[in-house]
Amino acid sequence: MLSRLSLLSNSRAFQQARWRIYRLKVSPTVHASQYHILSGRKLAQSIREKANDEIQAIKLKHPNFKPTLKIIQVGARPDSSTYVRMKLKASKDSNVDCIIEKLPAEITEVELLKKISDINDDDSIHGLLIQLPLPRHLDETTITNAVDFKKDVDGFHRYNAGELAKKGGKPYFIPCTPYGCMKLLEEAHVKLDGKNAVVLGRSSIVGNPIASLLKNANATVTVCHSHTRNIAEVVSQADIVIAACGIPQYVKSDWIKEGAVVIDVGINYVPDISKKSGQKLVGDVDFDSVKEKTSYITPVPGGVGPMTVAMLVSNVLLAAKRQFVESEKLPVIKPLPLHLESPVPSDIDISRAQSPKHIKQVAEELGIHSHELELYGHYKAKISPNIFKRLESRENGKYVLVAGITPTPLGEGKSTTTMGLVQALSAHLGKPSIANVRQPSLGPTLGVKGGAAGGGYAQVIPMDEFNLHLTGDIHAISAANNLLAAAIDTRMFHEATQKNDSTFYKRLVPRKKGIRKFTPSMQRRLKRLDIEKEDPDALTPEEVKRFARLNINPDTITIRRVVDINDRMLRQITIGEAATEKGFTRTTGFDITVASELMAILALSKSLHEMKERIGRMVIGADYDNKPVTVEDIGCTGALTALLRDAIKPNLMQTLEGTPVMVHAGPFANISIGASSVIADLMALKLVGSEKNPLNDKNIHEPGYVVTEAGFDFAMGGERFFDIKCRSSGLVPDAVVLVATVRALKSHGGAPNVKPGQSLPKEYTEENIDFVAKGVSNLVKQIENIKTFGIPVVVAINRFETDSQAEIEVIKKAALNAGASHAVTSNHWMEGGKGAVELAHAVVDATKEPKNFNFLYDVNSSIEDKLTSIVQKMYGGAKIEVSPEAQKKIDTYKKQGFGNLPICIAKTQYSLSHDPSLKGVPRGFTFPIRDVRASIGAGYLYALAAEIQTIPGLSTYAGYMAVEVDDDGEIEGLF
């Protein structure tokens, strides 16, 4: 600030302006000297000490509280350096961190603006000051307005200046020098209400801001400038004079009213041969002649100058406190209104009838900063994992898992219930909530399943964008997986066609510009082989062979190529048929992309670093000595991570009622966890979480809710969620919502089978209490399964129009008798969040209940024991029967050190058993284990009870046949 005043005083235009001065002829009077010196030094010291004390007090409760000022100095002007040192000293005296960044005078405006933008995005910096003057090639207005107005501790941003000038305006910051002047007046107990105040000077730095402050204090303000006539006469009427014109000793004694208050802002250097420097510092007021007529007067130096720096420190502290308060606030979700229709229109019509919020608004309501958001159009965005650093001190919100009973082929509405529940919590109960769901695969969307966005008035919007491509994460998985597959086959080809170890090694580690270097992945392989050499030319022939030859056994390769389309013709293919491949053919096949182990790794990784580590650990097969070969051995870890660098960032969308949804990852539920990502859950829980008060260890406010879902029924998806996902995340749900339907329970009670694409038998559309009463056994078993993990259960009866109240009462009674905390009916499909309010209240209550969580099995027990635990405790079976092929693989995994991993069992989702025809709760069956495979990077083994197709096919009439696009680009017929 002082540098700006120096500029003002040295302004040639200002100095040479012709001021019309008409001095008053007044008779000399006798005046007893009663003036008081308003010392800025003393008050500034007091302000710095108070700031120091306040910061220390806050740090006792919140150790991470650290007000920080960043000063950018462009060039090396001596006067600027002096002022910067003054600000640094004042900051240190006040316990404010001050970071000074000196930039070269020749920096371009583009470079400086980028630097400012980066600091704006840095949450550890609370105040940003650009030291003026800047070199002439830099536009000061552009530069100062580039500073985030919430960090503009100088108060120069157009927002702060404009708000200060408005009546009732609310600037974030007041410019430091005017602010200091007001503090001096306040210290002297000068009453401003109704007083005449004259401001000499109209600069945007001092004159205009101080005039606004005086007006806001109800003073009558006159601003004088170089064109003001009769200036002495105007000043002589003033009760308060603010001199900020930049002319040395300009204001004379005969201008001043007896008893006036004079604040001298001027900083001017005039010749003085008695001084070592040859000049002395004076103000705009002729202090010696004026002081005798004043009641209060500020000296120069020692008046306003120290206050400028003190108020800068005060503004930085204010900025830090504001940010701290903002960080503690619970997100406020502003819901979109729903206009319900009956009968309920199609899902796509409902989606298109709603006008979504811009995704930036959804993010802002959640407290996500703009630099933490990457926009993909108007309604989709990615969230940067860097947000964790800002939110690390927050306690997690409440964590709710939505699971289901054993379903019919039509599905029982878990996703719809998830959306309805968060709409009810956020839009109707005022509790900020986030739905976390999987990203749907294109294959089923264009095949027979249709979309996966929920349905009716409880869905993700825009649903066509949700179901088609989204932000390209699945395509990134495809590219990474197929690069790995190509690298494996190519490595085998090159090893087979280059018999000479030395020649092969030279091509594997080539010279570039005459220098041979190991890549980072090669260095890691050398370390695993205990070859501690950095010079490629230093390896012995034996070491060269060990390093270069992977000797992959093609019969053991587990990596297949992937595509995100249902294409049955790719289930088995032969590669290498071209003449260029020299007869090296191999039978392999394609999987659907979401079946790739990379998708499971994406879902289970907590960070980019962990994802890279998991990718490197992926076992792609074995060598001829039956030793595992990893992605790290292939040298693909870095490249695969690079392809998935953006995919690790969760996607943000919204529900029909404008409540936030995170869409991330989508591992194949048949052979994987079938749940959305760990990183999305961790992020969402922080966003709706609460800060704790260190004094009483209580939350400052009630936390919000994160609602996610598990694939298939609880016995499959729920068990995997707890035993695999929760082991990876370290999280445990506070409650489980178990979705049940009258339709599914009738199916388990003996009603005819339900088939997709066919009309429901009349047993499902007419009341039949007997079927329901028999079928609730499946519901009871699933409740028992959940209670095995020690988590409270809420049963949500997803109501259909044909359900009778008597049927629903049978379900409620059975659920409560089985140990559910609540059993409620939910009508969210027809009514959106309004129809799930009772469910939302039940969930809130359930999350407050105590939980006694435990895993189903000890991972250090044998593979066979873990399989038996799942079959007996979750499915109700008697024992397992392991095929010879499966047993051979189990023995191999044990020898390779993979026996202590959790287990995922791939089986039918239509029965608790392995046989889809066995409804209800079958007992005493022997569960077959036909094969066991390993996803070492993802961190689990998976056993197959039946032949699982890892790439679906298309039916005679497939979903894609109805899809059209009109001339406006609107997609029709997809849903």
Curated annotation (Swiss-Prot):
Any one GO BP annotation for this protein: tetrahydrofolate interconversion
Keyword Oxidoreductase: yes
Domain of life: Eukaryota
A Gene Ontology term for the protein's cellular component: mitochondrion
Reaction catalyzed: (6R)-5,10-methylene-5,6,7,8-tetrahydrofolate + NADP(+) = (6R)-5,10-methenyltetrahydrofolate + NADPH; (6R)-5,10-methenyltetrahydrofolate + H2O = (6R)-10-formyltetrahydrofolate + H(+); (6S)-5,6,7,8-tetrahydrofolate + formate + ATP = (6R)-10-formyltetrahydrofolate + ADP + phosphate
Signal peptide stretch: none
Residues that bind substrate: 83-87, 130-132, 301-305
Subcellular location: Mitochondrion
Chain intervals for the UniProt region annotation (Methylenetetrahydrofolate dehydrogenase and cyclohydrolase): 35-343
CDD domains per the UniProt record, alphabetical: FTHFS, NAD_bind_m-THF_DH_Cyclohyd
Functional description taken from the UniProt entry: Mitochondrial isozyme of C-1-tetrahydrofolate synthase. The trifunctional enzyme catalyzes the interconversion of the one-carbon derivatives of tetrahydrofolate (THF) between different oxidation states by the enzymatic activities 10-formyltetrahydrofolate synthetase, 5,lO-methenyltetrahydrofolate cyclohydrolase, and 5,lO-methylenetetrahydrofolate dehydrogenase.
Subunit-level organization: Homodimer.
General remark: Present with 11400 molecules/cell in log phase SD medium.
Protein family according to the UniProt entry: In the N-terminal section; belongs to the tetrahydrofolate dehydrogenase/cyclohydrolase family.
Name listed for the protein in its UniProt record: C-1-tetrahydrofolate synthase, mitochondrial
Organism classification: Eukaryota, Fungi, Dikarya, Ascomycota, Saccharomycotina
